[in-house]
Amino acid sequence: MANSNLTNAKKAKNDEFYTQYGDIQKEIEAYLEYDSEVFRGKVVYCNCDDPFESNFFRYFVLNFNKLGLKQLITTSYKPSPVANTQLALFGDDKTLAKSKGRPKINANKFIINEVQDIDRDGEFNLKDVAKQLKTNKHNEWTPLEGDGDFRSDECVNLLKQSDIVVTNPPFSLFREYVKQLFDYEKQFVIIGNMNAITYKEIFPLIKANRLWLGATGNGSDMVFAVPNGAEIAEGDRQKAARLGYVGDYTRLGNSCWFTNLDHGRRHKPLPLMTKAEVIKFSAKKPFEKYDNYNAIEVSFVKNIPSDFDGIMGVPISFLDKYNPDQFEIIGNGQTMANELGIKPVGQKFVDDYYRQGNKGSINAKWNNLVYHIGEKVYVPYQRILIKHKKK
């Protein structure tokens, strides 16, 4: 049992990333620019957030009245690797002393119904929130009965009461987390790994326009605070330091926002060149056709031709530019190969592949998207198949 607990604690520590306030602010403001009333009268639930540590709680409680929230609910997970140790109470507000009376072992639940200038100093800030919570004035601060797992009955009941979920869930549980959001028909803005786009549980939701990428930070460097002792690649730690975050921080270059809230960037047309212009000014060569599927390879999103009516294979980074009014998603070239009718590569491709010195394990029945240029073989990484929408 002891070994099991240690293993679980280690896994939790290495799966816990604390989002920066500025990243949250930029993302939420993008939805407000598109629809200033999107949060008005809504219950926001942050169900993977220690209220004492989370910048999600900090952002929404400080902007409670500006957003017009009806209620803010936050719940934390026990044990939190950083609880009571790493971050100052309510983020980096140095004017607040740490409360000695707050629960130190149990997972916590905060329910905010009202915020106001309780100390009457002329401004609303985190001091007012702290005082309101300590006096239980119109708000609730209690330990949870369980461990705060988002799958627990206790947290599911809170989820049922909410309208919009905003958080950074454990990446290792992303599939299960998203499934729960759709099971309970919730709107959401959450952080995940860019590679989640290709998950067989996630991609069909993207294809059906039930889930899409958020407005900011997709595939770029996002910095996260991590628990002391968490395993961090030294290169990522150094990159975070170069971005101004020294210490227990990591940089994730493949993180992104996932949402089903609309935003303006999603409807911004992608500027394109014609096929001839791409060949002349960018690619410097003709488009290649796949050996085993009737589509062309487009290795860079900027090279999508405006005048090609057929199917095109593009990198997954395309989804950051995806406009559902401009393009139709046909499928995922790897996870949907059988459904799409992608043919096996055949023995000639296998022979050419190994003759070229490649070490991967493939056979003639393999049906990944592939193409030749002369005798040289190419296996593009993770292609999404798209076509222009007919006007």
Please describe what each predicted stretch is.
Residues 1-391:
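Class I S-adenosyl-L-methionine-dependent methyltransferase catalytic core
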